[in-house]
Amino acid sequence: SSYLEDIAILTGGTVVKDELGITLEKATEEVLGLAAKVSISKEATTIVGDGRTQQQVEGRVKQIRNLAAETEQEYEKEKLNERIARLSGGVAIIQVGAQTETELKEKKLRVEDALNATKAAVEEGIVIGGGCTLLRLSQKVDSIKETLSNEEQKMGADIIKRALSYPIKLIANNAGTNGSVVMQRVMDNIDQPYYGYNAATDTFEDLMEAGIIDPTKVVRCSLENAVSVAKTFLLADVVVTEIPEKEKAPAPAAGGGDY
């Protein structure tokens, strides 16, 4: 019934239901609404409002947002946000096709990752990727370290600084480039906020313009979770890990002889 009420507000109509004392037998033209366009297919119906009820729609959206803020259940919150998107005209359907079930699942996961990244970007914005943002953050650690009086805390600050500079070196090394050289070149251009290394093209350029970006929320959460895991290791009395297996030496090639 909530969806029907949303449609009624969008079109300026009235929901026909017993609670309002209206039945189909008693319904008149007054309960009908108007729409600029209605598209009906086998699987979906799309209703486009004509703008007459914009004020009522905004009030309805505000009401649903308040409900979503008070709801703790993720499923219910997702459905409420879906209603907000539909009333606001922000609904998109992504259809994914594939030749095999395995390929379909893999594509579906990629689309979900892209959607989650987009949602995160909308929430907190974006920063340049390629490990360059973390490298720039590492330069802020020294000023924080100066405010610390505990030597152990200062040691922790040094560890975080080294860790923040590691991703860009790893990305460069995986691309077949000297990670230390790449890191130093980015640091030499620290005054250019979007300057960085594009591993895909092996070039130094404006990463924001090149589309090499990360959602700010993803970068922040990754750093927070990494620090949390490290803290757990430091506080644990014992850490159990698998014993690394030694690589077996290749058997010597059988030598040929004269017969």
From Swiss-Prot:
Organism's domain of life?
Eukaryota
What UniProt keywords are attached to this protein's entry? ATP-binding, Chaperone, Chloroplast, Nucleotide-binding, Plastid, Stress response
Q: Where in the cell is it found?
A: Plastid, Chloroplast
Q: What GO molecular functions are on record for this protein?
A: ATP binding; ATP-dependent protein folding chaperone
In the UniProt record, does the keyword Nucleotide-binding occur? yes
What GO terms describe the biological role, i.e. biological process, of this protein?
A: protein refolding
> Briefly, what is this protein's role?
This protein binds RuBisCO small and large subunits and is implicated in the assembly of the enzyme oligomer.
Please give the family membership noted in the entry: Belongs to the chaperonin (HSP60) family.
> Which PANTHER family did the record assign?
60 KDA HEAT SHOCK PROTEIN, MITOCHONDRIAL
Q: What is this protein called?
A: RuBisCO large subunit-binding protein subunit beta-2
